[in-house]
Amino acid sequence: MAAVWQQVLAVDARYNAYRTPTFPQFRTQYIRRRSQLLRENAKAGHPPALRRQYLRLRGQLLGQRYGPLSEPGSARAYSNSIVRSSRTTLDRMEDFEDDPRALGARGHRRSVSRGSYQLQAQMNRAVYEDRPPGSVVPTSAAEASRAMAGDTSLSENYAFAGMYHVFDQHVDEAVPRVRFANDDRHRLACCSLDGSISLCQLVPAPPTVLRVLRGHTRGVSDFAWSLSNDILVSTSLDATMRIWASEDGRCIREIPDPDGAELLCCTFQPVNNNLTVVGNAKHNVHVMNISTGKKVKGGSSKLTGRVLALSFDAPGRLLWAGDDRGSVFSFLFDMATGKLTKAKRLVVHEGSPVTSISARSWVSREARDPSLLINACLNKLLLYRVVDNEGTLQLKRSFPIEQSSHPVRSIFCPLMSFRQGACVVTGSEDMCVHFFDVERAAKAAVNKLQGHSAPVLDVSFNCDESLLASSDASGMVIVWRREQK
């Protein structure tokens, strides 16, 4: 049962940063061996109920040993070596639509995360205050964490030395998405409205375009790397999603949209990369099984407008979707069946398209609340607090940017939780990349990068924040190099 072994490995990976804090190579060896054993045992044919029981017990034991997780995202940033070992495969997983086991004993159960969102802040604070010495918690004394993040202020840390490289293979067509590979400093991909996706390598010099993925007949609106970087999923205005092998660039599978509509966004389910959520121009979100090419039964829901942005929380229990009418919907994701249950709706601003959503469980030491970063066409970047386990949002603060019509995106910085303050980065229609400190009450602007000649649509950091990539509406992709202190 491929789905269960991937979930077991995901649980191990989330706790891996707490193992042997001073010997990261042992953590890497451990998680690789776990991956190998789990793949082998997945073929043994054990009863599904036994596997699910093992998954529950494994989670309980790890929780007793290491305590509640503080921030899966920052644990990933701290221990990036675990990601490659969590290989995604296209082995056929259980088809949720046809498997009575998935719909029987567990079909009636509502998904419940380790701790509800309304208790997450208290849990995070308890973890911060009560952990034994030597544990991996972002504090001023966390030397290993500070070594990664740099023992500097935010302004000093996000000073950039200039352009490292400029990619112009998509010139004259907008590049709506640029993303570094997971746990990779030098591998980058970007998609273009010219219908192609570029895979780029930044080292060794000079940076090169390794291959261009072609097959879509219209513009590529979005793409996502799998956890292990061996697969990419792309969505297109040609009403199809495609599954690509990153190693050789071949198209593994083409999947038509269930509604025959333009596909506008996509995201992997973080625990089970066999499932991908897509949003389309007919106002629908669909959970797709990329192993079978089928829509998951119960995994569809309708929004009020064209679906432009998607984001899961780190455990994969909550999904947020934004549309072009200005609404953000939260959905409960059932891990057993892939079913979506609509939970909450927030109208950010009536008629203002929501173009980007990023979720984070722990922003910084000062902001230990689950948060959502949202771009809408309001000339503002919005930071929301997640206040309960159904994804209810409460506005925390906003930052001034220029965005009135373009699909601008933003990100949380991957290493933010290990230093004083916390930084977010966003594109803007003023052709600049903006950095903001979410904890600074006045003068939140930290830095501004100038060099684009068109609105900046997307930004992406590599895993150690040494490089930042930004893409614009004219097809230019700029890779910026951070100053070395």
Swiss-Prot record:
It is found in: Nucleus. Keywords: Methylation, Nucleus, Phosphoprotein, Repeat, WD repeat. It comes from the Eukaryota. The keyword Transit peptide does not apply. SUPFAM superfamilies: WD40 repeat-like (SSF50978). One of its GO terms (cellular component) is nucleus. The keyword Cytoplasm does not apply. GO terms for molecular function: promoter-specific chromatin binding. InterPro entries: WD40/YVTN_repeat-like_dom_sf (IPR015943), WD40_repeat_dom_sf (IPR036322), WD40_rpt (IPR001680), WD_repeat-ST_regulator (IPR051350). WD repeats lie at residues 170-210, 215-254, 302-341, 406-446, 451-484. The modification Omega-N-methylarginine is found at residue 114. The modification Phosphoserine is found at residues 70, 74, 79. Pfam families: WD40. Its main location: nucleus. The modification Asymmetric dimethylarginine is found at residue 114. Gene3D superfamilies: YVTN repeat-like/Quinoprotein amine dehydrogenase. PROSITE patterns: WD_REPEATS_2, WD_REPEATS_REGION. PANTHER family: WD REPEAT PROTEIN 26-RELATED (PTHR22838), WD REPEAT-CONTAINING PROTEIN 13 (PTHR22838:SF4). This is WD repeat-containing protein 13. It comes from Pongo abelii (Sumatran orangutan). The lineage of its organism: Eukaryota, Metazoa, Chordata, Craniata, Vertebrata. The gene is WDR13.
